[in-house]
Amino acid sequence: MKRTYQPNVRKRAKTHGFRARMKTKSGRNILARRRAKGRHQLTVADE
């Protein structure tokens, strides 16, 4: 049986990256929440 997690850097960035987050209102809300919480890493692009 094939496993569900097949790592791919490009897909990861396109789906969860900073620019992807900035594209939508809800994505910007996510970034705002993470900034408010003081997260060191806002998105997967910050690795």
From Swiss-Prot:
One of its GO terms (biological process) is translation. Keywords: Ribonucleoprotein, Ribosomal protein. Pfam families: Ribosomal_L34 (PF00468). This is Large ribosomal subunit protein bL34. The keyword Manganese does not apply. Gene3D superfamilies: 1.10.287.3980. InterPro entries: Ribosomal_bL34, Ribosomal_bL34_CS. PANTHER family: LARGE RIBOSOMAL SUBUNIT PROTEIN BL34M (PTHR14503:SF4), MITOCHONDRIAL RIBOSOMAL PROTEIN 34 FAMILY MEMBER (PTHR14503). GO terms for molecular function: structural constituent of ribosome. GO terms for cellular component: ribonucleoprotein complex; ribosome. Belongs to the bacterial ribosomal protein bL34 family. The keyword Ribonucleoprotein applies.
